[in-house]
């Protein structure tokens, strides 16, 4: 799981629960829990882990956008995270929002970031140590040094490439959302004026990439899953989208890190943007 270089040890983007347990006391690592249900952390979490709230801390609170550079610097500084800290993320719901946080951190240039395979579910299933103590760490002065714009897509880029054979779109929502029977999963508040999908998108629900225990499926299974729909490594660009950008971060992680696709982007505007756009092309019904 580690690549030893001359002076540092580079941690792989995906680590096991055992690796995490072995590194609980490593001062260069900060464990961060990011849950869909933000009350989960208080019921028990990995010792030493801090929590990020996806609703209030990872999104702009006024504009429809990701957290600003300044707010991210403040969040990381307050949690004692420096530019060279290895951030190890995990969460509930098979790492939905942990993957979103990883995408966001990489977008803002923090490369030393990993995901615990299986997330919170696997950690608890293995009866590993938890605590209800909330740790505090000495503040740092975190500074973003670069922004990786090539990890993010937007509506205008997608519109221009809709008929491009070298471009692949993956809609990772449920089949019911894809065909246009429903606009959002039951109980979710963010919806859209229109239901359906972006023309040409292939429907590969995010959950098809994970096994029963919440870990990712094998590389061979994943290759068959995406390759079977024509979402292959030889595409010039692959873009994943969902409803608000969190489920698609999960698929983005699979394509980029587990399958090694060169150019994968997350369209975080996703259906809550596209389904509300005046004049945007939409399709309903099953894949052509």
Question: What do the PLM-derived regions correspond to, one by one?
Answer:
Residues 169-225:
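A mid-sequence, solvent-exposed acidic-amphipathic segment
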Residues 262-288:
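Cysteine-dependent PTP/DSP-like catalytic domain, specifically the C-terminal lobe
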Residues 2-39, 120-193, 282, 287-288:
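Flexible, polar/low-complexity N-terminal or interdomain linker segments that lie immediately upstream
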Residues 41-48, 102:
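Glycine-rich loop at the start of a catalytic domain that most often binds anionic cofactors/ligands
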Residues 43, 125, 276:
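Phosphate-coordinating loops and pocket residues in cytosolic domains that bind phosphorylated ligands
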Residues 66-167, 181-182, 196, 243, ...:
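Thiolate-centered catalytic microenvironments shared by cysteine-dependent enzyme domains
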């Amino acid at each position: 799981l580690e690549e030893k270089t001359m002076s540092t040890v580079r941690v792989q983007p995906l680590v096991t629960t055992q690796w995490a347990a072995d590194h609980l006391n490593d001062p260069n690592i900060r464990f961060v829990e990011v849950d869909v249900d933000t009350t989960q952390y208080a019921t028990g979490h990995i010792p030493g882990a801090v929590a990020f709230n996806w609703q209030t801390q990872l999104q702009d609170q006024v504009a429809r956008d990701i957290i600003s550079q300044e707010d991210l610097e403040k969040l990381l500084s307050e949690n004692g995270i420096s530019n060279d800290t290895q951030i190890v993320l995990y969460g509930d719901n098979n790492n939905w929002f942990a993957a979103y946080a990883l995408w966001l951190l990489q977008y803002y240039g923090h490369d030393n970031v990993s995901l615990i395979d299986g997330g919170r579910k696997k950690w608890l299933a293995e009866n590993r140590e938890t605590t209800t103590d909330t740790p505090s760490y000495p503040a740092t002065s975190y500074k973003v040094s670069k922004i990786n714009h090539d990890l993010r897509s937007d509506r205008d880029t997608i519109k221009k490439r809709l008929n491009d054979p070298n471009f692949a779109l993956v809609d990772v929502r449920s089949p019911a959302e894809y065909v246009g029977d429903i606009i959002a999963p039951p109980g979710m508040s963010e919806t859209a004026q229109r239901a359906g999908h972006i023309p040409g998108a292939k429907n590969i629900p995010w959950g098809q990439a994970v096994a029963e225990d919440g870990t990712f499926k094998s590389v061979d299974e994943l290759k068959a899953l995406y390759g079977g729909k024509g979402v292959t490594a030889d595409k010039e660009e692959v873009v994943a989208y969902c409803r608000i950008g969190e489920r698609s971060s999960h698929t983005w992680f699979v394509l980029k890190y587990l399958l090694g696709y060169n150019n994968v982007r997350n369209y975080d505007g996703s259906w809550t943007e596209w389904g509300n756009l005046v004049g945007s092309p939409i399709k309903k019904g099953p894949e052509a």
